[in-house]
Amino acid sequence: DGKTYGDPLEQASLFAVKWEYDPKSSKSKPKFSEEIKKRTWKGTPSAKILARNHFASSLQRMSVVATVQQNEGENEQTWALVKGSPEKIATLLKSKPDGFDSQYRTLAEKGMRVIALAHKVLSPGDSKRVNDAKSPLSRDEVECDLEFAGFLAFACRVRTDSEEVINALIASSNRVMMATGDATLTALHVGNEVGIAKGGLAGAAVLELEQSNNKSGGSLRWVSAKRDKDGGIQVIGSYKDLSIPQLAQKYSLCVTGESLNAASYAATTTTESGTSSESELWDYLDSVSIFARMSPDDKERVLKRLKQQGRHTYMCGDGANDVGALKQAHVG
């Protein structure tokens, strides 16, 4: 019917770049009926999808392989086109450009939902393997040694009545928390807008892994969400040395799925009876204001633990990533 359906962010990005997509041919091209400024190509560029690697929350990315013709008369090339969370895409780049982290942080601090874009041109040999049944090109081969293409930033405005509703819930002695797959700074911005968090970035303490490849509890620390004047990290203290309830009296606490699971891993000890005990963080989940970069399983686990602690849980969620947690909640 000529209309585009699907994820609102996908639709917004197509609208913004003034391209159109034909699902029958799996081909995308510019809308020349629209005025396109600073056009750098000649003729009609196009991209046709050959294969898709669908989004996976555990991977924080998705990709397509497409034939791309940039200029009229040029031969088509086979490209790998990848998008995902900036922190994940950064690990897949051949070389991370200067300013990558600072620009991402600047956008996220404004509450933007930020997606990183990257690509590479496949070799003729790899191009032939895209749909080869005997020796197909693997996802890992597609999503590696990428060139950074840029950030895609979306302004996702909150509902006008959200703050009023949340304040009413808090006033009636309900503990209100946010669990989201969005980045920490984006979540904190929205949390402050609606009253779940207080004090801006300076008023937020974030639990982070000092070394993301190390699950040792000694690498966990609380840091301020606000950088110092030189852009450096302001460390509040070690995770092991600070009382969570006392810290929550001074800061709005924010944890990520990664740090939440690392805290659990670090403090889990197996006894002779086979039982295990988890970290203090899991005993004080209700002290946390913002759960960011949470997978569907992370959200579900938090709701399940809150119920085990005798909490009556209510959850509002509108995405497929919320289904498991909604099922765990008393009211969802």
Where is each model-derived feature located?
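Cytosolic catalytic headpieces and adjacent flexible linkers of membrane translocases
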Residues: 4-5, 20-43, 62-305, 309, ...
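Conserved N-terminal boundary motif of the eukaryotic protein kinase catalytic domain
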Residues: 46-51
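Catalytic core of PPM/PP2C metal-dependent serine/threonine phosphatase domains
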Residues: 8-9
